[in-house]
Design a protein with these regions (language model features):
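Hydrophobic core segments of beta-strands in well-ordered, beta-rich domains
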Residues: 1-36, 41-44, 54-57, 71-75, ...
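Beta-rich accessory regions
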Residues: 104-130, 135-219
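Structural motif
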Residues: 36-42, 91-107, 157, 170
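A short local loop/turn or secondary-structure capping micro-motif enriched for an aromatic residue
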Residues: 36-38, 62-64, 91-93, 126, ...
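Residues that flank catalytic or metal-binding motifs in active/ligand-binding sites
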Residues: 15, 39-42, 54, 70, ...
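Surface loop/turn signatures of beta-propeller and other carbohydrate-active proteins
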Residues: 1-21, 52-73, 113-134, 190-191, ...
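Active-site-proximal structural scaffolding
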Residues: 12, 36-39, 65-67, 97-101, ...
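Conserved Ser/Thr-centered positions that define the repeating blades of beta-propeller domains
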Residues: 43-49, 109
Length: 219
């Protein structure tokens, strides 16, 4: 196995690095496939963004949640270590995971001594079929904000000449509450809200109009 890849890893399935800086060191997680054909997330470190050294395998699938793990992201939030990834070939599991390509959030503890994630919570990031490859960034005021691809390898309908077609989700602020990942639209969207209309006890029937609810954009 080439230097830098975890022993026994696939030479083809190694992609999607996510890089961040802590102090004078840079870190990167990447999607990888292990010897048993399932996903794993190796962690690397560098001082110059050119020479990278393998630190650990943060977590690995062991054929439990899909196969290849793509587009990983790793960060600490509200006292928890959080790993986001997009597994291929997921199997449906109750109402939490749908079959095919999906998303996965793993939370727990992780020491910066060994950089191994000890799981406490596993959940889907989004229950929609057209949601994939979420990535996060930190805003200047310290918020963890996530954006994802609003489409799926399983369901995209772009014409052959328009493979670039697609769109991204509304940015979401992340937080951890009671051991689960919470998401809310970024607060900057509030300034675009207009008049608020409240309707209560409306029976669900055929096509109907609600007083005060009109316009091209309704949230």
């Amino acid at each position: 196995c080439p230097e830098g890849l975890p022993k026994g890893s696939s030479l083809e399935d190694f992609r999607d690095p996510k890089i961040w800086q802590e102090g004078e060191s840079f870190y990167a997680v990447a999607g990888s496939r292990s010897r048993d054909g399932s996903g794993q997330i190796p962690l690397y470190t560098s001082k110059n963004l050119k020479d990278w050294s393998l630190v650990s395998i943060i977590d690995q699938c062991q054929n439990r949640y899909g196969k290849m793990w793509e587009c990983p992201d790793f960060f600490f939030l509200d006292g928890k270590a959080v790993l986001l990834t997009s597994p291929q070939d997921m199997e449906a599991e109750d109402f939490e995971f749908h079959s095919g390509n999906g998303t996965l959030c793993i939370m727990g503890t992780c020491s910066k001594e060994d950089w191994v994630l000890h799981r406490e919570q596993v959940q889907a990031i989004d229950y929609g079929l057209d949601f994939y490859a979420p990535q996060t960034t930190l805003t200047p005021d310290g918020r963890r904000v996530m954006v994802a691809w609003l489409q799926s390898w399983d369901n995209y309908l772009s014409p052959e000449s328009l493979y670039w077609g697609g769109m991204m989700t509304i940015p979401r602020e992340l937080s951890v509450k009671e051991g689960r990942l919470y998401q809310n639209p970024v607060r900057e969207l509030e300034k675009y809200h207009g008049k608020k209309t409240i309707a209560k006890k409306i029976p669900v029937q055929e096509k109907q109009s609600l007083e005060g609810a009109q316009g091209r954009q309704i949230d």
